[in-house]
């Protein structure tokens, strides 16, 4: 999936991401497990950035057609939430989303963090979730001239109705 986000000919604009560390307050279940809804919430912020870059508006999230969890996320994990636009219509656009674990706490055999602050890189990053979602911006709210010119140019080249 890392290659998909970097070298995908279907990508409109560019891949955007945000990184954050999961805190003890993010843990919801036993063993400091973070609930999957936390990933979906972060994808909402990724989708908002994509919408601003495309249409100059924050958008409304219509829904997800797919969400798959592939690995657990725990307090202490450093996560990257990212995505890209795959298809643009007249008012809606479809995005691919990803959640990767980049770093985690280093724990001993008893589950305690080594030295109280030990951490380690994960190379390659671990895919924890992926999904597909649709967002929309009403025609009267679209202001692509305030967005990222690369997004508008790619959407137009892909034949997007909004940029015809």
Question: Where do the language-model regions lie?
Answer:
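Residue-level marker of positions within ordered structural domains that often coincide
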Residues: 1, 48, 138
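Catalytic strand-loop segment that frames the active site of acyl-thioester-processing enzymes
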Residues: 3-36, 163-164
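HotDog/MaoC-like acyl-thioester-processing domains
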Residues: 7-10, 14, 74-75, 86-164
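Generic structural detector for well-ordered beta-strands
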Residues: 17-23, 68, 132-136
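N-terminal first-folded block
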Residues: 25-62
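Hydrophobic beta-strand-centered segment that forms part of the acyl-chain substrate-binding groove
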Residues: 47-94, 107-112
């Amino acid at each position: 999936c890392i290659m998909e986000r970097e070298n995908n000919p279907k990508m409109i604009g560019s891949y955007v991401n945000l990184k954050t560390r999961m805190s003890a307050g993010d843990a919801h279940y036993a063993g400091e497990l973070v609930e999957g809804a936390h990933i979906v919430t972060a994808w909402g912020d990724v989708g908002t950035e994509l919408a601003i870059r495309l249409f100059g508006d924050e958008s409304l999230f219509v829904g997800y057609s797919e969400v798959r969890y592939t690995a657990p996320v725990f307090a202490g994990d450093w996560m990257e939430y990212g995505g890209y636009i795959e298809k643009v219509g007249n008012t809606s656009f479809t995005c691919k989303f990803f959640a990767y674990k980049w770093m985690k706490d280093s724990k001993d055999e008893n589950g305690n963090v080594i030295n109280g602050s030990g951490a380690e890189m994960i190379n390659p990053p671990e895919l924890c979730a992926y999904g597909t979602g649709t967002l929309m911006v009403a025609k009267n709210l679209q202001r692509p001239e305030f967005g990222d010119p690369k997004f508008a140019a790619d959407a137009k080249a892909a034949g997007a109705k909004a940029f015809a």
